[in-house]
Amino acid sequence: MNLQNPKDRKLVHNRNIHCMGYIRKDGDFDIEAVLTDSKTYDFPSDTHGIVKKNTPYHHMRVRITVDVNLRVKEAHAMTISGPYQICPKGAENFKNLIGIKIGPGWKRRVQERIGGPSGCTHITELTGPLATTAYQTIGGEISRQRRRGIEANNLPEINQENNLKNSCIAYSEAVSYTHLTLPTKRIV
């Protein structure tokens, strides 16, 4: 299915964000995200000469390790490619995410700890997709393990309905979401 037919146009910019969720042997979860920006044409750069078309001029990679309660235990970031020589320094404060929990207030706490003039806009932007990927990874893994009859990492009983209430139109109190079958022993 496509969006409505667009006007005649030409692609000039690509931004790709790719997220991955892993369960570790120790029961924690690694959540990774990669961001790349590229142009569909060659262009001059003050620090890199001519940047060839489809070559990432922004290329950032981040990883957080979270426990089943979504608390950040490890945080790593790197700038593989940035437009300025100082750009890799913006990844250094990513470790300041250690100790905070993904949940209500996540974006505000992230901004306070790694945003602004000592951080990297693009690395900070990746923390939104990291959070939703963590929810999907952990919730999916808990559900998968329970379907297989495996004790899912000794997780506490969590009511999914309370976690999702009013988070989107499907879970809106204004629209009865009783049509959804909600597992009662999942995090997501």
How should each PLM-predicted stretch be described?
Residues N14, G21-I23, L35-Y177:
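Active-site- and interface-proximal helix/loop "cap" or "latch" segments in soluble metabolic
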Residues M1-I23, E32-A33:
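N-terminal "first-domain core" detector
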Residues T178-T184:
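Conserved small/polar residues in nucleotide/adenosyl-binding loops
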